[in-house]
Amino acid sequence: MLRCSLGLVKHGLTGMTTSTPPTAPAAKRLTPPTVAARAHQIIGWLHQRRDRLRAHGVQQYFKHEVVSLGIATPALRAFAVAQSKPLTAAWGLREATALCDRLLQEPELEVRGMGILILGAFRRRFRPALARAGRRWLETRLDNWALVDSFCGSVLSPLLEQHPGVEKTLRRWSGARCLWVRRAAIVTLVPFARHGQLLETVYELAGEHFADPEDLMHKAVGWVLREAGKTDPRRLRAYLCRHGPAIPRTTLRYAIERFPGSERRQLLECTRPSARGAPRGGASRRA
């Protein structure tokens, strides 16, 4: 993914860096902080480190206007670790979810991203019911690809790893009217596809979005197909040839990035629509 100052997108199930910023406020261990107090502290710390020039540069990665503080990625991640360590000792999942909910109410990318990263530190305590809060956030507060992809990597993918039944939830989400819910259904599967897991689901859901009107869905589908091809390129090749002209060209180009140049050209040619207006497959929005 593109590297902007937000730096929140996680392409797997690994944890965050363990370095700690020297200026981060000390966390108290004896008395568990209230959600409101910790949210106030986090918001204040982040706003104090606003970099207007860097924030202006973040905008180039988004088609619509976003609000950014322009905080450098290392400082942002290190502060997330500094906050998460004592909170995982003092809090349960309920408090962590409440903190995330509170921070997601703020307009800045970094503040909302911090809520996601801290909630992700509680991954070992995740319960399937967290998916309900996740859908609500996707429909109301996670409104760009960077935050959605970060939420998938930090929260939804670990949730699916611990509770395989969440796969059924993702199948329902795949047909949602909300773009961000649909994207989350696909991006959550990326780390699994990379390791050759849940490939039946990956290929099935990918096919539902060939007719999706959103370019961000075409890119997400291409991404997950590319990852699926890392462990079984023959299966990906057969899938692409079978669906041929129905596949959006953006999806196809993303999916074949790992193939040799000559094979990429061959796949682009053999999947090219034979005539303008060739029908595209896909399912209609359901929920």
Language model features by range: what are they?
Residues 11:
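Cationic, low-complexity basic patches in intrinsically disordered or flexible, solvent-exposed regions
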